[in-house]
Amino acid sequence: MQNTSFDNESDYSDDSDFASASETENRIGLTVPLELAGGRLDAVLAKLLPDYSRSRLTLWIKEGAVIVNDKPSQPKDKMIGGEQIRVTVRPSEENLAFVPEPMALDIVYEDDTVIVVNKPAGLVVHPAAGNWTGTLLNGLLAHCPELSQIPRAGIVHRLDKETSGLMVVAKTLPAQNSLVWQLQERTVKRIYRAVANGIVPFDGKIETQIGRDPHNRLKMAVVKFGGKPAVTHVKVLERYLAHSYIECSLETGRTHQIRVHMREANHPLAGDPVYGNPRHPCGDTVKEAVKSLGARQALHAYRLSFTHPESGETVSFEAPIPDDIYHLLSVLRLEAGLDSSLSNEEEWQDKFGADDDDDWNEDDYDVEVVYVRE
């Protein structure tokens, strides 16, 4: 069964519900300020309790966990100011799954403030329906028990289950606030490497609105209305007979953003089980190499740069391209009559030169390709 939890590349800053990992049922007492008079109860609570999503607060109201002036209430009830509200904070099912589980983690960097981890393909980031155990969050809680006191165990952005690569995790609440702010301000640099179907003809920018697919609620899609702005910069590293090796830089972090954008550009990622094209014409050897990826798409979060929350310095990290994607690249290069002996990122950079991705801007592109849905 397909996982509908959308454990993916989006940022928690987009849909924050920052409950503590160790959340237990407790009560909160509030007084409605006069400046919120005239507002609905659910809207007033959303302003008074910004750490919880409005949908979650609405559910608590309907379940009787919100008492106004000693009486049950409804989400649409109007407030006049001065009401006494008691909220029983109930742990969500996902928070009950926030338990430590020892697992081998590829820690790229760690200090007293942050952890940078290289997530393998196949590992879900966060407990959700269909994946309540064995997630990266569970492993982080075992590795660093104090993360139980940080909302979402310090996780501020996500990668899809079948996407590998770098993630940063906050070890303190101030660090988490800093990283969330950086994500919201789009100052965190995230560079992905991917193999796309077809000959990608451009270096440029894909800019759309992304929302739920109106025809399939288990997928995301480019939509005309009701979506969120999404911007991906694409650079072609190498072209083969029927595929391209590309680098994608995110300005925003929407659900399945790169996968949806490359599908919109008619160049879905190789091996993508949701947005890909399993009938993409290519040689038998390449088909076998794509199959060897298993359930994962050829997408890897290769480079991550952000301002360190404590030192204020810009820090950058890289995670080598995984063996399965390198095998696919070698097969593609061999089929195209190119040198297929490159076995790691250092050899790739020695042969082709290392690009300075930290200085990317729109002027770097030969052609700017913009897909805008208004």
From Swiss-Prot:
Residues 39-112 form the S4 RNA-binding domain. Pfam families: PseudoU_synth_2, S4. Residues 1-20 are annotated as: Disordered. Coiled coil: none annotated. InterPro entries: PsdUridine_synth_cat_dom_sf (IPR020103), PsdUridine_synth_RluA-like_CS (IPR006224), PsdUridine_synth_RluC/D (IPR006225), PsdUridine_synth_RsuA/RluA (IPR006145), RluA_PseudoU_synthase (IPR050188), S4_RNA-bd (IPR002942), S4_RNA-bd_sf (IPR036986). It comes from the Bacteria. It catalyses: uridine(1911/1915/1917) in 23S rRNA = pseudouridine(1911/1915/1917) in 23S rRNA. It is found in: Cytoplasm. Residues 8-17 have a biased composition (Acidic residues). One of its GO terms (cellular component) is cytoplasm. GO terms for biological process: enzyme-directed rRNA pseudouridine synthesis. One of its GO terms (molecular function) is 23S rRNA pseudouridine(1911/1915/1917) synthase activity. The active site is at D160. Its EC number is 5.4.99.23. Keywords: Cytoplasm, Isomerase, RNA-binding, rRNA processing. Responsible for synthesis of pseudouridine from uracil at positions 1911, 1915 and 1917 in 23S ribosomal RNA. Belongs to the pseudouridine synthase RluA family. NCBIfam families: PRK11180.1, rluA_subfam. This is Ribosomal large subunit pseudouridine synthase D. It comes from Neisseria meningitidis serogroup A / serotype 4A (strain DSM 15465 / Z2491).
